Curated annotation (Swiss-Prot):
Induction: By light. It is a multi-pass membrane protein. PANTHER family: MAGNESIUM TRANSPORTER MRS2 HOMOLOG, MITOCHONDRIAL (PTHR13890:SF0), RNA SPLICING PROTEIN MRS2, MITOCHONDRIAL (PTHR13890). It is found in: Plastid, Chloroplast membrane. Belongs to the CorA metal ion transporter (MIT) (TC 1.A.35.5) family. One of its GO terms (cellular component) is plastid. This is Magnesium transporter MRS2-11, chloroplastic. Residues 101-110 have a biased composition (Basic and acidic residues). InterPro entries: MRS2-like. Residues 111-122 have a biased composition (Low complexity).
Amino acid sequence: MALTPIPSTFTSLFNFSDHSPYPSPSLHYLLPGSSPSFSLQLSALSRTPIYFEALKVLSRSKCFAKSPTTAEDFVGDYESLNVSDDDDGSDSNSSDGDNGGGRDDSKKIDSSSSSSSSDSTSLGIREPVYEVVEVKATGAISTRKINRRQLLKSSGLRPRDIRSVDPSLFMTNSVPSLLVREHAILLNLGSLRAIAMRDRVLIFDYNRRGGRAFVDTLMPRLNPRSMNGGPSMPFELEAVESALISRIQRLEQRLMDIEPRVQALLEVLPNRLTADILEELRISKQRLVELGSRAGALRQMLLDLLEDPHEIRRICIMGRNCTLRRGDDDLECTLPSDKLIAEEEEEEIEMLLENYLQRCESCHGQAERLLDSAKEMEDSIAVNLSSRRLEVSRFELLLQVGTFCVAVGALIAGIFGMNLRSYLEEQASAFWLTTGGIIIGAAVAFFLMYSYLSRRKIF
């Protein structure tokens, strides 16, 4: 319920001036105990009457009495009052012109608030920008920068799909993956991260070895005819095959570099045990472990893809007016020719994946065999070192037994060396008898201890 302010209550607070040079009335705010009064021209009130709600005025008057107020606060308060007054005027039976002015003011305030909220959101969250290499189906290569929103809009992907190829998540997304979506295929093959679409492919981290190898493999294949003279495959399949070729060739090249070194070490190590050779064996073993893990991860990815016919069929229907039936994943196309071509491509894709799976398994198996040979050589070296360590321990024990026997003889000699009269020094033969007894006793004690240790199989 809107109430008109009582003159006795609000005369000291609000005073309308009739002598203003402006066509619209001016509103003066007079506060007790504050700075001199100031006036604020309100042009929006030229045709709209002011209605104050009693609760709002009372609460606002309390706030005025408690704290000092600035001109900005009055402006904000008046805007809120103006919006509420316009709402009240629209609910009551006011004129059409008054309602139109209130709606315009409220729309302006709402638009300004929405724009400010969007600006604050954009300032709070920084949208990532990717620098990619774009390879088109025609063979044109260009480097461009694209933000996340544009990338999602152009490829038809979702934000969670980008995480598999995001270069900033390289450490967390190191497992190879091939994700098939409606309009794009996402490739994550170690250092190669790309998005293959119908007419182009976007390559992230193109300066890395995997990106350069992928571009070098893809460019010769972008021609009207394939290498065997038959019709070329769709561009996205060419991109997938080029990615697999570049990745497997890199694994095979690493295997060819490591294999001769390991074979040479296996021939030398049984006879030569030096620190340099052992260190080279350790480094070669570490490289074999890394190569085997990468080949095994790629092999597992290809196996999972071959065991899921739904993903293969999704690759085949990209860019065609075809859908997959939910019950049995059967192809449903508007044109019979599209269905026939999709079924033929499905067989080609399966054969293609099986071919690269065999190459990957061969590389993985050879790396595992070399790694097993290196581990066996390490076991042989450990046994050899253990036998030598045992020989050294036996020799040390033999020296300790001899030292014990000699120490017993030295004890007897020390006893006779004391300045006590034993009457043996008066006889000339006593020296020779004592010396002979010490030597013979030490030898007998040594052989007795040696025979005891031999019976206990310590020697």
